[in-house]
Structure formats: structure tokens, C-alpha cells
Curated annotation (Swiss-Prot):
Lineage start: Bacteria, Pseudomonadati, Chlorobiota, Chlorobiia, Chlorobiales
Main location: cytoplasm
Annotated Gene Ontology cellular component terms: cytoplasm
UniProt xrefs under Pfam families: Aminotran_3 (PF00202)
Enzyme Commission number(s) of this protein: 5.4.3.8
Metabolic or biological pathway, per its Swiss-Prot or TrEMBL entry: Porphyrin-containing compound metabolism; protoporphyrin-IX biosynthesis; 5-aminolevulinate from L-glutamyl-tRNA(Glu): step 2/2; Porphyrin-containing compound metabolism; chlorophyll biosynthesis
Gene: hemL
Protein name: Glutamate-1-semialdehyde 2,1-aminomutase
Catalysed conversion reaction: (S)-4-amino-5-oxopentanoate = 5-aminolevulinate
HAMAP family: HemL_aminotrans_3
SUPFAM superfamilies membership: PLP-dependent transferases
InterPro entries per the UniProt record, alphabetical: 4pyrrol_synth_GluAld_NH2Trfase, Aminotrans_3, Aminotrans_3_PPA_site, PyrdxlP-dep_Trfase, PyrdxlP-dep_Trfase_major, PyrdxlP-dep_Trfase_small
Family from the record: Belongs to the class-III pyridoxal-phosphate-dependent aminotransferase family. HemL subfamily.
Highest taxon of source: Bacteria
Compartments reported by the entry: Cytoplasm
Length: 431
């Protein structure tokens, strides 16, 4: 077990000034117990904590670090921007046009795009746009999917809300809750029923095409296409939330992987290269309703700031130049097969779900295809598993219901180390 004296000291101090001692709930280790680890530095595939312990990083800042931490090209680009351009102006800059054009080239659904400062801003804005465009109030989301902490989304939500065992939040008004309808992921009939019960009143269906905040749950064959058809028939705006899976499962996101094009797409994480960023975009006829061109208001003081755009642009250029996706897939298969072999050796039948370089090991024998099946996982066994990995220098998400991310800079030696640690952690989970 690593020495974490300084982390303990810092957490106790943090709790005096910061609610729960953290600025995002999942970081508090509530579902796994123990003290959150305070990091001091990241480099490549590794992080070092304030006590000098080093960890192989499978959280990757919750997804953005597909290229690892402190990539030399991104670091150099940021340094140049800091020294020669500036941090923010509150005016248009040329870089905004460059990243917008690049995003429209890469992502199938994008004809126009608006930069914002977070994934939450992106999803809130996309839903507002859908309501403004259709003149309707209700939206359909899916149980366990997480679309940020906007009020409309904190109803049967995933990610940190699910981690804390509270997928709903006080402070969400009854009116908001009534306008948010929840369907079952991978169940098109549940969606059709809600649409029929609310005929002519549904503005949008928003979905993670790879649900990454209830563990990892891929859309089953035909499900997204059926949603597309239903939305076309009913005049509903289809929104893909690709904040997590965008540029992760494929350069063009899950929509390019599955061949289904939404009306609007929300993005974040990877397109910020580790800095705060978000974006939403889609069909021109919808995006032309966004202010100042149209009547649907959206604004942001720091939207499109040079630092975030620099990191995002350089990340996208590296992904296009180097095409790490085949190698990421190879590494992901190595881990998946290694974990599968370990489970077999121990006579365990736990479920592994994976799409590209994001995956989740569920501590359940029930196939995980939606929220209901995901929560059959044994969180107590997962907690033991997590701490065993941590003790072995492997940092994974401190929640059963979050994804494990591979970065392009991980070596085969790193993977071998992880597979060995996985075996030991599985043993520990059963004790």
C-alpha cells in the first residue's frame, strides 16, 4: 500500500473550504471508500501524487487524454499561445474559424458549430435549440445516461450522480422533471411509447451513442438507426451527446462508427486537449437559429478562448496526422483478452463491455445493456478491486459506473503490468 500522508492532510484541509473536499463529486472516493489521491504531476501515461507515488493512468482526466498527459506538441503549442497570443480577448479570433472548419470536416453531422466552455454547456444549449426550433417543451433521455449537470438531465442520471447512489437531484423543479421523459437504453419500444403518449410535444431525443457514464454500454445493432427513423417520422430533433465518445471511439465519433447521423451533436473532453471546452453543432437549418443569427440565445465570456482552442486544434491535428485508432484498438483487445483470461482462471463470469479504447468491467454476471442491468453490479466487490489496483500503481475510476480509458502512449509493458494487477485485484475483490 502506497504512503498517502500528504493526500490525507490535503483532503482534511479541503473539506473546510470546498463542499465534500472536491470540485466534482466522483473524485471524493465516496463509492469506494478511503481518501482521494491528490496528484502533483502527469506525464505520458503516468501520474505522480503529492507523496511521490506513481500511477498508470486509466482515467485520463475522465477521457480527454487520448494522447496521454503533457503531449509535447500540445504543450509546445500552449506555450507559444501563452507567450505570443494571450489567454482571452472577448473578441472573435481566427483560431475559432480554424477549429470550426476542422470539426465540420471530421464529424458527419456538423454543418455549423458553436464553441462553449464545457460539455454541460453544450448539452444545455443543444436542448434549448431543439426546443426553440420545434416549439415543443419535452425531451426524452435515457436512464443512466449523463449529459452534464443541467437541471433537465439530473433525472435518473448516470456518472457522479449514479456513483453517489442519487441519480436524481433536489433543486430540480417539478416542471423541469415533467418535461424530461426517461426511456430505457437499447429499447426502442420504450421510446416509441413515450413519443406516442406525448404526441407532438417532444422536442428532442438526447442519447450517448456509447453510454459511458453507466460504465460502458454500446448501442445495440439497429437501435440508433431506429431512433433516427422515429425522429424523422415525428419531427423530433435527434441529439447525440458525444462529449465522451466523440473522437475516442473513432475520429468522427460514434456517429461515424455506427453510420447514423444525428441532427445535433455535443462535444467536449478530447477537443479541449485537457482544457475546459465544449461545442455543439449540426444541421445548418438548426444552427442558424442560434443568436446572433437567430433567436435562440447562447453566450459565453470565455467561449472560444485561445488557450482551449490551441489545445483542441493541436489534439485534432495529431489525431489526423498519426491516426492512433488502430493501435488503440490493438491495445484495448490485449487488455480485454487478458482480463478475460484472468476471469476464466478464477472461475468468474463478470461482464466486460468495450467500444474502442473505452471499456468497463462490471462486477455482475448479467449482460449489461442498460441502466437496470448495470446496477446489478456488486459495488462492494468493485471497491475492493479498485483499491487493490491502486495499491499496485494502477489508477482507475473510483466508481463501478465509469469508463476505463486507454491512451496512445501506453506501452505493451504497461498493458502487461495492468493484466497482472487485474488478476491480483480480482482475487482481492472476492475476499
Amino acid at each position: 500500500m502506497p504512503q498517502i500522508t500528504r493526500s490525507i492532510e490535503l483532503f482534511e484541509k479541503a473539506k473546510k473550504f470546498i463542499p465534500g473536499g472536491v470540485n466534482s463529486p466522483v473524485r471524493a472516493f465516496k463509492s469506494v471508500g478511503g481518501t482521494p489521491i491528490y496528484m502533483a504531476k502527469g506525464s505520458g501515461a503516468y501520474m505522480t501524487d503529492v507523496d511521490g507515488n506513481t500511477y498508470l493512468d486509466y482515467v485520463g482526466s475522465w477521457g480527454p487524454f487520448i494522447l496521454g498527459s503533457m503531449h509535447p506538441r500540445i504543450t509546445a503549442a500552449l506555450e507559444y499561445t501563452l507567450k505570443n497570443i494571450g489567454t482571452s480577448f472577448g473578441t472573435p479570433i481566427e483560431m475559432e474559424i480554424e477549429i470550426a472548419e476542422l470539426l465540420c470536416q471530421i464529424v458527419p453531422s456538423l454543418e455549423m458549430v458553436r464553441m462553449v466552455n464545457s460539455g454541460t454547456e453544450a448539452t444545455m444549449s443543444a436542448v434549448r435549440l431543439a426546443r426553440g426550433y420545434t416549439g415543443r417543451d419535452k425531451i426524452i433521455k435515457f436512464e443512466g445516461c449523463y449529459h452534464g449537470h443541467g437541471d433537465s438531465f439530473l433525472i435518473k442520471a448516470g456518472s457522479g450522480a449514479l456513483t453517489l447512489g442519487a441519480p436524481d437531484s433536489p433543486g430540480v423543479t417539478k416542471g423541469t422533471a415533467q418535461d424530461t421523459l426517461n426511456a430505457t437504453y437499447n429499447d426502442i419500444e420504450s421510446v416509441k411509447l413515450l413519443v406516442q403518449e406525448n404526441k407532438g410535444n417532444v422536442a428532442a431525443i438526447i442519447i450517448e451513442p456509447v453510454a459511458g457514464n453507466t460504465g460502458v454500454i454500446p448501442a445495440q445493432p439497429g437501435f440508433l438507426a431506429a431512433l433516427r427513423q422515429l425522429c424523422d417520422e415525428e419531427g423530433i430533433v435527434l441529439i447525440f451527446d458525444e462529449v465522451m465518445c466523440g473522437f475516442r471511439v473513432a475520429l468522427g465519433g460514434a456517429q461515424s462508427l455506427y453510420g447514423v447521423t444525428p441532427d445535433l451533436t455535443t462535444m467536449g473532453k478530447i477537443i479541449g486537449g485537457g482544457l475546459p471546452v465544449g461545442a455543439f453543432g449540426g444541421k445548418r437549418k438548426l444552427m442558424e437559429r442560434v443568436a446572433p443569427l437567430g433567436d435562440v440565445y447562447q453566450a459565453g465570456t470565455l467561449s472560444g478562448n485561445p488557450l482551449a482552442l490551441t489545445a483542441g486544434l493541436e489534439t485534432l491535428k495529431i489525431l489526423m496526422d498519426e491516426n492512433p485508432y488502430p493501435e488503440l484498438e490493438r491495445k484495448a483487445v490485449i487488455l480485454e483478452e487478458g482480463f478475460k483470461a484472468n476471469l476464466a482462471k478464477l472461475g468468474l463470469n463478470y461482464v466486460q463491455n468495450r467500444v474502442g479504447s473505452m471499456s468497463c468491467l462490471f462486477f455482475t454476471e448479467t449482460p449489461v445493456v442498460n441502466y437496470t442491468t448495470a446496477i446489478t453490479a456488486d459495488t462492494k466487490k468493485h471497491a475492493k478491486y479498485f483499491h487493490s489496483l491502486l495499491d499496485q500503481g494502477i489508477y482507475t475510476a473510483p466508481s463501478q459506473f465509469e469508463a476505463m480509458f486507454i491512451s496512445s502512449v501506453m506501452t505493451d509493458e504497461d498493458l502487461d503490468k495492468t493484466i497482472k494487477a487485474n488478476y491480483n485485484a480480482l482475487v482481492a475483490s472476492q475476499q
